[in-house]
Amino acid sequence: MGVLLVGGTAFRVWQVARIDDRDKADVVVVLGAAQYAGKPSKVLEARLRKAKLLFDQGVSEYVVTGGGRREGDRYTEAQAGKNWLVRQGVPADRVIEVGQGNDTLGTLRAVADEVKKRGWKTAVIVSDPWHSLRARTMASDAGLDAWTSPTHSGPIVQTRETQAKYILRETAALLYYRATKAGADRIAIDQEVG
């Protein structure tokens, strides 16, 4: 039974990673990842590029950047994300930064609170492909009608070995979340990923 549960979950992580849903939504939500003195890491920049593409395609009129700060940081992941998007031409009044949360669950709960305060309900979540199912599940549990449009570039999707590691990580993290309703981002492979 356990093998079926793990295998089935891994298959769903892989399957949802391939879904790129660009239906119109109230907001595009970019989940945070590491930033260095306000400069997005390669992982975060790949997510931001995807969010800008969705904004430019008219998927939503607003982008929410999420993510807090690590000890010693001057910038939140959300600030670094907003600054990058504005430099790339997204109007500042169309980017909402939510600088709370140091893991996926905390970030999505804070983002959901902000989104719902504005009377919005639907969100396209932008993250890495393997993170999509867990992020969508957490966003739904936080009260959003959410779907995903993952990145398909950046360091997390480069090699089969990297992909396999992240599918295994996300399978474990999703099973842990479903069992406990607690975050599982400490199942770490790479410090750039939030």
Model-derived regions, located:
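Hydrophobic membrane-insertion alpha-helices, especially the h-region
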Residues: 1-9
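A structural signal for short, hydrophobic/glycine-enriched beta-strand patches
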Residues: 10-168
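Perimembrane helix-loop junctions in membrane proteins
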Residues: 13-20, 180-188
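Extracytoplasmic/luminal low-complexity segments enriched in Pro/Gly and acidic/polar residues
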Residues: 193-194
